[in-house]
């Protein structure tokens, strides 16, 4: 008996040695996602299985010789609407001295690190790798916990004491922000001006669900998008050039995965980014604290300027109390 971690078994041949001969099971599958045809997914799974049986035994299971479609295979260019997608290189080359370390809490203390709250999202590690490739240490901590409200507050205190981060990122994830108590605790602390290290307000960035958590913490409503769900779609994002959008074009392409959107209310946060219609909020910032949120995924290969946006956030410095008072006076 061994222990193994399995990824998605899209096309698999599982073999077993019997008393007299080998036996094999062929498995193939696909995924029904937004925009796909279930019937075509089933046919594709049969096609995948047939490729295995043909290579192993010389016949196509469930198909005649003429049933399977024959199509031209080619490498197609990246759509021009995306601009230059630098992340499509075989490997992002970064000097060893510039690469940050990645730790999972509890872990040894990493100096000048970014605290990344993981909300059970498959992209969390991608975000951590992107942060590290930009030269910053990162510590990952799970945002979902069964602790009560008092214990959550104590856990947040413990994490802040041990990690002493220079900044916090509230990561993306499935479901709604309230499903992740630690994420909501950090969101509320930041809005209240209580996310402090050495009397400095440390920067916080919310990504997708993390962005939604910030809105909820400030009293905004989280609703089903009136324009429907968007899954894995590069989308045109408009912005006003403030917050993490400073220095970026007023229209940029970013990858979206969301069915929920925030409705703004009067509070401490202000929208600074919208979808192409100008109706759906895609970004927000705090009036005077270093708090930003974006509804999209900047770490995605479908976000050509996403790495630049993350770098802008990572370069933000903590805000001293005296500077905060000056900003409030303005």
Model-derived features with residue positions:
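Conserved hydrophobic core element of enzyme catalytic domains
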Residues: 1-73
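A short, charged/proline- and glycine-enriched loop
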Residues: 107-113
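A short beta-strand-loop structural module common to alpha/beta enzyme folds
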Residues: 137-146
């Amino acid at each position: 008996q061994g222990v193994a971690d399995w990824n998605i078994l899209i096309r698999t041949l599982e073999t077993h040695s019997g008393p007299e001969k080998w036996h094999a099971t062929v498995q193939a599958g696909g995924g029904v996602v937004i925009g796909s045809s279930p019937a075509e997914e089933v046919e594709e799974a049969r096609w995948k299985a047939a490729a295995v049986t043909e290579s192993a035994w010389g016949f196509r299971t469930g198909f005649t010789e003429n049933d399977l479609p024959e199509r031209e295979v080619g490498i197609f260019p990246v759509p021009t609407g995306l601009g230059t997608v630098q992340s499509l290189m075989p490997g992002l080359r970064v000097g060893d001295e510039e690469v940050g370390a990645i730790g999972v809490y509890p872990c040894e203390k990493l100096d000048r690190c970014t605290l990344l709250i993981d909300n059970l999202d498959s992209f969390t590690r991608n975000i951590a790798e992107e942060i590290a490739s930009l030269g910053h240490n990162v510590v990952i901590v799970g945002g979902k916990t069964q602790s009560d409200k008092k214990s959550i507050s104590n856990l947040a205190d413990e994490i802040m004491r041990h990690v002493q981060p220079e900044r916090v990122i509230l990561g993306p994830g499935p479901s709604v922000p309230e499903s992740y108590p630690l994420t909501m605790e950090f969101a509320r602390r930041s809005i209240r001006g209580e996310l402090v290290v050495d009397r400095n307000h440390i920067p916080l960035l919310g990504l997708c669900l993390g962005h939604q958590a910030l809105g909820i913490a400030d009293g905004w409503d989280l609703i089903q998008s009136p324009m429907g769900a968007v899954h894995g779609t590069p989308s045109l994002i408009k912005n006003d050039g403030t917050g993490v959008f400073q220095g970026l074009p007023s229209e940029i392409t970013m990858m979206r995965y969301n069915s929920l959107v925030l409705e703004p209310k009067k509070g401490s946060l202000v929208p600074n980014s919208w979808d192409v219609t100008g109706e759906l909020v895609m970004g927000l910032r705090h009036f005077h604290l270093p708090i930003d949120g974006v509804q999209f995924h900047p770490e995605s290969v479908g976000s050509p300027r996403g790495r630049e946006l993350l770098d802008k956030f990572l370069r933000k410095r903590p805000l001293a109390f005296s500077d905060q008072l000056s900003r409030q006076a303005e």
